[in-house]
Amino acid sequence: MKVCNLVEAYIAYRRSLGERYQSPAVMLRSFARYIGEDKECMSIDEKTCTAFLYSPNNTVSASWFLRYSSLKWMFEWAIVRGYMQEVVLPKEKPKALEHVKPYIYSAEELKRIFELALSYQKNKSKTPPRCVQAILKLTYVLGLRISEPISLQLKDLNLCEKYLVIRESKFYKSRMVPFNDQVVLLLNDFLGWRKAQGWSSDNETFVFLDKNMDRLSIDVVRNAFERIREMAGIKRTDGSRYQPRLHDLRHSFAVHRLTEWYRSGKDVNRLLNSLSTYLGHDHISNTSVYLSMTDDLLSEANNLFNAYRNGKVET
């Protein structure tokens, strides 16, 4: 059996089990192209697989482990069916990457990011700065994953009822995200600009487009954000190998919200479940990690605990 046929058969098998199997499918097809789609499965060797795992820069990245596990499962599936004889992968795996500690942006840093989003481009581009700015603002003020604003269609916005719909995001769940009057103003302002560009108002049209009328991609927005962050002079000083990321806007939203609740004397433990639902987490434990993420948050939590202990806050 040829590699391309093995990959497609395995993807079909995983999807027949009810799985979406999207990211691994992209990776496996990339593997087939890398080693040659017409290559016979029996001739796949460990050296070639190892080179693929470390490509393109011969380094260990987060994708290394996804590639390894996906290939391992496919090879084991192929062995049972007689398409291969062994798992041709390195016996030892590299040390797991250090956990990326989220960077929590300050109010001043957020202001610089949003302002520079309109002026970061040095040359003409098909990416409208107004779209980039609106995406970054929505990502922060609503605590979204970057894939979520990019995937929004006009039908997903309900400004009258003040909510938007996130359709089948992470964990394949849809959810409604309510917002306040400030977000209504933000969206109305952007949609007014969008209309002035003569873009389609069909409900199925994506909200954020480039000048070719194509949906903006995650990579385009991520690259734009990196330029904006560098122009804003925002960088880590804690020795971490990773600089502040686009996804940290979402983490900043969560931490800022929790800090605000503590400072106003709210019952954070009770509200944590609501925040978890709002963020689209599949388990509250994924949200509770924010409780110890910054010194400010820990300080506010300690102050509230002391107030309860001394009887200054009613229960």
Regions found by a protein language model. Name each.
Residues 1-315:
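Conserved catalytic core of the tyrosine transesterase superfamily
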